[in-house]
């Protein structure tokens, strides 16, 4: 049995429009900041169980942020994914963060790109772990569950509130049977995800995250899917910040080709393939993700001389094999 990671701080901020935004902090207080965006579904406790040890060892302050409609974040559907950057601007201002790296798991990936686009002089680098690709316009990728949801985007728009309440009710009903539900989900998952779920602390982390994330509302899941099927408000082609992708080559939810597709659109992107892993395999690479992002931090020893606002390079994708934590 493992132990879920314990936040150094667990709280909320108030935005200028009166909404609340939930967040948690892990790792080194006062260290270089990494903002972590959870998956879909997910909340602020969805993070590697080793986050404190890995972040402390590297002097990193990890801040996990809940999107509107989950945990302690007030329900709110932004018009576009890009509008999430306004919430992050206020959060970082209130927490005293100027420059930062960002990382996002699965559904958190598009929000990483949005912030990198919005703050090219503040975001030093970004990581996308099994991230969702655009579904609209010339940047769209084919296949995957989000592409399927795109076919139903009109009813999703109309039914988002009742669907959110339905998911919330289902989560509340299942929580007393969390252990049993987890084991059923584990057995029906691909081998790569089963290995992740069996790692020390993963089960406890996921159960805690769903429990605390669904206490008040659980609408963020539906809001995310609705936003994924809209125009994002920007193109990955215009993201000048270095972005690194981690993606399992057996991902059954977001195909590996999606990671390569989005990376191929960007001026400075690389893909780290995770052989034999599925959708959640990149959670096991959290230490590697930290090391790569810190290596791109311009003011750190041994970091490259280029800055996030450097002139655009010729678009390229380089594939490397992931090595775990």
What are these model-derived regions, one by one?
Residues 1-25:
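N-terminal cap/lid segment of alpha/beta-hydrolase-fold proteins
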Residues 19-72:
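Conserved HGGG/HGGXW glycine-rich cap/lid loop of the alpha/beta-hydrolase fold
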Residues 83-101:
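Conserved acidic catalytic loop of the alpha/beta-hydrolase fold
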Residues 99-143:
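Conserved hydrolase catalytic core segment
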Residues 147-234:
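Alpha/beta-hydrolase
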Residues 239, 245-247, 251:
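Short beta-strand/loop motif that positions the catalytic acidic residue
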Residues 252-258:
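Conserved alpha/beta-hydrolase "acid-adjacent" motif
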Residues 268-314:
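Catalytic active-site module of serine/aspartate enzymes centered on a nucleophile-bearing elbow/loop
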């Amino acid at each position: 049995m493992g132990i879920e990671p314990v936040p150094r701080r667990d709280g909320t901020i108030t935005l200028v429009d009166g909404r609340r935004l939930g967040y948690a902090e892990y790792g080194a207080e006062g260290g270089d900041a990494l903002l972590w965006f959870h998956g879909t579904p997910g909340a602020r406790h969805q993070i590697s169980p080793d986050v404190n040890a890995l972040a402390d060892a590297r002097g990193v302050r990890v801040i996990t942020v809940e999107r509107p409609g989950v945990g302690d974040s007030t329900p709110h559907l932004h018009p576009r994914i890009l509008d999430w950057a306004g919430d992050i601007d206020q959060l970082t201002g209130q927490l005293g963060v100027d420059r930062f790296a960002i990382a996002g798991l699965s559904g958190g990936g598009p929000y990483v790109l949005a912030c990198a686009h919005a703050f090219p002089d503040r975001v030093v680098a970004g990581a996308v772990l099994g991230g969702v690709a655009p579904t609209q316009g010339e940047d769209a990728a084919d296949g995957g569950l989000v592409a399927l949801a795109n076919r139903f985007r009109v009813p999703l728009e109309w039914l988002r509130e009742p669907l959110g309440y339905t998911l919330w009710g289902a989560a509340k009903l299942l929580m007393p049977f969390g252990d049993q539900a987890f084991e059923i989900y584990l057995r029906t998952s691909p081998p790569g995800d089963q290995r992740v779920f069996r790692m020390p602390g993963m089960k406890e982390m996921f159960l805690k995250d769903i429990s605390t994330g669904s206490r008040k509302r659980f609408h963020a899941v539906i809001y995310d899917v609705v936003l994924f099927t809209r125009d994002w408000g920007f193109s990955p082609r215009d993201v000048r910040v270095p972005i690194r992708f981690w993606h399992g080559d057996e991902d059954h939810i977001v195909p590996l080709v999606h990671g390569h597709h989005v990376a191929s659109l960007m001026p400075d992107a690389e893909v780290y393939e995770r052989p034999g892993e599925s959708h959640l395999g990149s959670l096991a690479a959290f230490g590697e993700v930290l090391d790569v992002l810190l290596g791109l931090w311009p003011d750190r020893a041994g970091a490259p001389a280029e800055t996030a606002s450097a002139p655009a390079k010729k678009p390229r994708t380089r594939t490397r094999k992931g090595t775990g934590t």
